[in-house]
């Protein structure tokens, strides 16, 4: 079936159909080659009908990648596991479908006046950050941001790095205005863990990537929250202090189409908003730095280690890029 697709396009061209010009046919032939190589790499198989749909999405993404990388941007795009998807599909499967406006969150973090170190990376300070995880086709990014921050907080306080149960938050944290695979906020998840008196480990409450019934067992809780530090809305300097002096910080931001194919470099965008009502993805700031005069955050994502920079990305710091300073928080562990 695969070899038939260019012939179908060629037939349409011979019949005078406008959909397939000669130049487009040549491009599609090359894109098909790249797509089939990508399919082997990612172990993808499709029905004949889906193959054509995925090929078109892949070709569109590949053109966008090449056009973007030919221009003068601070970050590069590249093929990844999402390359056969449209951005609309990514939004449905991986981002929040339930709006999460954190503007009503009451801040309680009072920052000092600095100065702060010019750079920080908790990954290099010791065994304080768990490996990059993969949320799968579930808008549960907020649970990974939550566990990532608390895992680090416990490790910094005790020297022991736990692996915590995202699935418990998916299944059990609804009473704190979280919505499982439809979205949630780390600040609200920290409050759930605090009042629930604990969270289990991922070994005893494994991740399934779908909504389920709550199976929390208090006797198996391994991490606890004493309090939650909510950083003042849009106070990015307070985020710097928190990461420098205390802990990796959970935050949310708005993902737009140009982020989907991020490969490396310092991400910035003119297509996203800076307001708290537009954020749709939660992540974890594990450090910060500056490159060629551009300050950035070092951010742990939850799309697996093969996305971006081994599962991480850099995003421009100091401009509330895509609303990243709207929903920042971190837990104070009870140890």
Curated annotation (Swiss-Prot):
The active site is at residues 141, 281, 301. Disulfide bonds join 102-327, 138-181, 172-214, 272-322. Its EC number is 3.4.22.16. GO terms for molecular function: aminopeptidase activity; cysteine-type endopeptidase activator activity involved in apoptotic process; cysteine-type endopeptidase activity; cysteine-type peptidase activity; endopeptidase activity; HLA-A specific activating MHC class I receptor activity; serine-type endopeptidase activity; thyroid hormone binding. Glycans are attached at residues 72, 101, 230. Residues 1-22 form the signal peptide. One of its GO terms (biological process) is response to retinoic acid. It catalyses: Hydrolysis of proteins, acting as an aminopeptidase (notably, cleaving Arg-|-Xaa bonds) as well as an endopeptidase. Residues 23-97, 106-115 form a propeptide. Its main location: other. Keywords: Disulfide bond, Glycoprotein, Hydrolase, Lysosome, Protease, Signal, Thiol protease, Zymogen. It is found in: Lysosome. GO terms for cellular component: alveolar lamellar body; cytosol; extracellular space; lysosome. Gene3D superfamilies: Cysteine proteinases (3.90.70.10). Belongs to the peptidase C1 family. Composed of a mini chain and a large chain. The large chain may be split into heavy and light chain. All chains are held together by disulfide bonds. Important for the overall degradation of proteins in lysosomes. This is Pro-cathepsin H.
């Amino acid at each position: 079936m695969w070899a038939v697709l260019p012939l179908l396009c060629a037939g349409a061209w011979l019949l005078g159909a406008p959909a397939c010009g000669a130049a487009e046919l040549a491009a599609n032939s090359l894109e098909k080659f790249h797509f089939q190589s990508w399919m082997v790499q990612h172990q993808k198989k499709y029905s004949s009908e889906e193959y054509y749909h995925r090929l078109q999405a892949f070709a569109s993404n590949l053109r966008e990648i090449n056009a973007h990388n030919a221009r003068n941007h601070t970050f590069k795009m590249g093929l990844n596991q999402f390359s056969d998807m449209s951005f609309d599909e990514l939004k449905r499967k991986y981002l929040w479908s339930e709006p999460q406006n954190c503007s009503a969150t009451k801040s309680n973090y009072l920052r000092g006046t600095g100065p702060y170190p010019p750079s920080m990376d908790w990954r290099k300070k010791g065994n304080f950050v768990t490996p990059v995880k993969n949320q799968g086709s579930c808008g549960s990014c907020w649970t990974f941001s939550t566990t990532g921050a608390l895992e680090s907080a416990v490790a910094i306080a005790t020297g022991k790095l736990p692996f915590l149960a995202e699935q418990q938050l998916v299944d059990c944290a609804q009473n704190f205005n979280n919505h499982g695979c439809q979205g949630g906020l780390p600040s609200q998840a920290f409050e759930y863990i605090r009042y629930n008196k604990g969270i289990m480990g991922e070994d005893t409450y494994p991740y399934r990537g779908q909504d389920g019934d709550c199976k929390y067992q208090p006797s198996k809780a391994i991490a606890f929250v004493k309090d939650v530090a909510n950083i003042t809305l849009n106070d990015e300097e307070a985020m710097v202090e928190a990461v420098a002096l205390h802990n990796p910080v959970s935050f949310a931001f708005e993902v737009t189409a140009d982020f989907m194919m991020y490969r490396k470099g310092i991400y910035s965008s003119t297509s996203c908003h800076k307001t708290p009502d537009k954020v749709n993805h939660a992540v974890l700031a594990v450090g910060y730095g500056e490159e060629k005069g551009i300050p950035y955050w070092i951010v742990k994502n939850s799309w697996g280690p093969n996305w971006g920079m081994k599962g991480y990305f850099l995003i421009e710091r100091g401009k509330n890029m895509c609303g990243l300073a709207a929903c920042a928080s971190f837990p104070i562990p009870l140890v």
